[in-house]
Amino acid sequence: MITVNTLQKMKAAGEKIVMLTAYESSFAALMDDAGVDVLLVGDSLGMAVQGRQSTLPVSLRDMCYHTECVARGAKNAMIVSDLPFGAYQQSKEQAFAAAAELMAAGAHMVKLEGGVWMAETTEFLQMRGIPVCAHIGLTPQSVFAFGGYKVQGRGGKAQALLNDAKAHDEAGAAVVLMECVPAELAKKVTETVSCPTIGIGAGADCDGQVLVMHDMLGIFPGKTAKFVKNFMRGQSSIQAAVRAYVAEVKAKTFPAAEHIFAD
């Protein structure tokens, strides 16, 4: 079974970590069998599964339900579950209560969004036995504050994002996930922090990659993000598409130049 120690060893060895979102048992089993290292039960289910316009309406009850479903299907992969909007920002104690529910539902790690200001919560959780994935850069729960889905950390804002990563790393984060960050900045973060980094729209030099399942299968309606590749194209089955994704991440051929944001 993949553990926090496994991810650290993969970073040290230069082996790419493959993460993919999963929301139910059948796809979890398929992805696990295809070699996906980490299954992310993302609050992206609000948009991909529930048909909402953002991740904000997703509840802790929703996240626990889908975590339980994924846990029934996965045998080897690590399961990371999102703390949903409103379930952890009020206090460290609130975050622990929500994280404990997700861990009881089958998660091996929880993911929270936010920079330096959330590092104290990261430390609070990890000191109480809950591994944390810290999500920085474009944080979808703050989409309305950002004014839309925009690349983060460009120009004069690069140092602030680096500080976010360092703060979480020093607080004991098990993983730092970067979304929509210039490739050179993501590379610098990866070289700076001791924990593994996972990227989505953050270049090819992160320690691993993640995509939303619906995006990589080409079944999400609407405009496709720059960092997305449709792995279903040219494949005869979903499992073949997932295996192709795993193979390209491991071979360091995905993401390619067309999927990367410049400074």
UniProtKB/Swiss-Prot annotation:
Its cofactor is Mg(2+). Binds 1 Mg(2+) ion per subunit. It comes from the Bacteria. Its EC number is 2.1.2.11. Keywords: Cytoplasm, Magnesium, Metal-binding, Pantothenate biosynthesis, Transferase. The active site is at E179 (proton acceptor). Pathway: Cofactor biosynthesis; (R)-pantothenate biosynthesis; (R)-pantoate from 3-methyl-2-oxobutanoate: step 1/2. One of its GO terms (molecular function) is magnesium ion binding. The keyword Hydrolase does not apply. 3-methyl-2-oxobutanoate binds at D43, S44, D82, K111. InterPro entries: Pantoate_hydroxy_MeTrfase, Pyrv/PenolPyrv_kinase-like_dom, Pyrv_kinase-like_dom_sf. It is found in: Cytoplasm. Homodecamer; pentamer of dimers. Catalyzes the reversible reaction in which hydroxymethyl group from 5,10-methylenetetrahydrofolate is transferred onto alpha-ketoisovalerate to form ketopantoate. Belongs to the PanB family. This is 3-methyl-2-oxobutanoate hydroxymethyltransferase. It comes from Neisseria gonorrhoeae (strain ATCC 700825 / FA 1090). The gene is panB.
